[in-house]
Regions:
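A short, N-terminal "cap"/entry segment at the start of jelly-roll beta-barrel domains
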Residues: 1-33, 77-78, 97-99, 106-149
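Conserved short histidine dyad/triad with adjacent acidic residue
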Residues: 21-24, 35-52, 137-141, 151-168, ...
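Short strand-coil-strand connectors
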Residues: 32, 68-72, 95, 184-188, ...
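Glycine- and acidic-residue-biased ligand/ion/polar-headgroup-sensing regions
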Residues: 53-70, 169-186
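A cytosolic small-molecule/anion-sensing beta-strand core signal
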Residues: 61-62, 77-78, 96, 177-178, ...
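Short acidic-glycine-tyrosine-enriched beta hairpin
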Residues: 71-87, 186-203
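Ligand-binding loop in jelly-roll beta-barrel domains
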Residues: 86-111, 202-223
Length: 223
């Protein structure tokens, strides 16, 4: 289930905000096995310790804070990505207004193959845009997570490169990490700039193009 408008650029900083002493959450994609939510924590607020049955992945799109995993504090700031493994107690604290994309598995499945970057294995936050480099005349992609019901991929496009129209079996969230990209959904084009996101609905043809400049994006497919 998609809970925000699809096939258009959205600035999550405008979509979710927290006033003093508030923690605000919003689930934007909700599927049988995985989901995507937004969080906004006012300065010096905290989500208290809890443990989940599936892995959690966090992308910070505003501010900075700390995510403590089994009492091990991990700093996170704008542009950073961090994995929290299932069944680990963790909490989130904001040092200023902190906004996060939370990507979650509802139930972990240890039998599913999960291909991850070595950076995820370090259990520390890292700059997502730095995962892939630009290569002249090429499209570069790296999977951070590759499971049957959840895929998180970081991609770079050289100016002029494109992906032909195709369909995905699940709803996808794209977040532009650098530059700007042109997206065409069911024949209708729109631009998504750095810091903006868009939902590409399942089973509807869409294409991607680096029309005016190089760009990078995070693609999250949930099923």
């Amino acid at each position: 289930m998609v809970k925000i408008e699809v096939a258009k650029a959205i600035n999550f900083n405008e979509l979710i905000n927290s006033k003093e002493a508030e923690v605000v959450s919003m689930r934007i994609l909700n599927e049988a096995n995985s989901y995507i939510s937004l969080f906004s924590l006012a300065k010096n607020e905290e989500i208290t310790a809890e443990a989940m049955l599936g892995n959690r992945y966090y992308y910070c799109f505003n501010g900075n804070g700390e995510i403590s995993v089994e009492n091990n504090k991990k700093p996170i700031k704008t542009g950073d990505f961090l994995e929290v493994l299932a069944n680990n107690n963790y909490s989130v604290k904001s040092l200023d207004t902190l906004k996060l994309i939370e990507i979650g598995e509802k139930i972990g499945d240890e039998t599913m193959e999960n291909q991850t970057l070595k950076m995820l294995e370090s259990a520390s936050a890292f700059s997502l845009a730095d995962c892939v480099e630009y290569k002249e005349g090429q499209i570069v992609s790296k999977n951070l997570v590759a499971k049957a019901n959840l895929v998180i991929t970081v991609m770079s496009f050289w100016k002029g490169e494109s992906l032909d129209p195709h369909k995905a079996p699940g709803d996808a969230l794209v977040t532009v990490l650098d530059g700007e990209g042109k997206y065409i959904v069911d024949g209708k084009a729109f631009i998504v700039k750095k810091g903006e996101s868009a939902v590409l609905p399942a089973n509807i043809p869409h294409a991607v193009e680096a029309e005016t400049q190089n760009f990078k994006m995070m693609l999250t497919l949930v099923k």
